[in-house]
């Protein structure tokens, strides 16, 4: 068993706390700045080096990037392209010893928050939800569509994930 923590793609105080607590393995978030190319080995090399130089060995990716995940879950016109982009990540993940990618099939939106920096005791920042601040999206998906899209995704990626 290994002790791992969640690391955002950019260094923040959580990185320092994890290292000072003895954490040496990371569940990492990929950059979602539009510049990170999931299919580009050099981008993966640079990202992984940033973590290893800090003393953290990446062991898993979480979440699957939302710009891919959302199209796959709702099964829109970018679904197949998004699945290909996910599959293109696998060889680079493997080459760095990252054998796990976390995904969810919650109906379109994963974890829903309306605030991400509410101050609590001792100045700690927490997330929150306030119905008055919630702006509903105009997308609907049935349970059957979601299950169909899940099956489509799994059948597409498993042959590549098992390599």
For the regions a language model picked out, list residue spans one by one.
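Active-site acidic/histidine proton-transfer and metal-coordination neighborhood
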Residues: 72-163
């Amino acid at each position: 068993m290994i002790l791992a923590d969640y690391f955002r793609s950019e260094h923040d105080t959580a990185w320092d706390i994890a290292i000072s607590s003895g954490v040496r393995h990371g569940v990492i978030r990929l950059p979602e700045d539009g510049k990170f190319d999931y299919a580009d080995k050099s981008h993966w090399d640079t990202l992984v080096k940033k973590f290893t130089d800090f003393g953290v060995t990446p062991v898993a990716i979480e979440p699957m990037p939302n710009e891919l995940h959302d199209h796959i879950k709702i099964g829109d016109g970018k679904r197949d392209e998004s699945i290909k982009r996910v599959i293109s990540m696998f060889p680079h993940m493997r080459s760095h010893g990252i054998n796990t990618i976390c995904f969810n099939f919650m109906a379109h939106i994963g974890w829903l928050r309306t605030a991400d920096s509410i101050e609590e005791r001792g100045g700690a920042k927490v997330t929150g939800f306030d119905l008055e601040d919630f702006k509903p999206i105009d997308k609907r998906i049935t349970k059957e569509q979601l299950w169909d899209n899940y099956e489509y995704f799994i059948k597409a990626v498993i042959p590549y994930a098992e390599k």
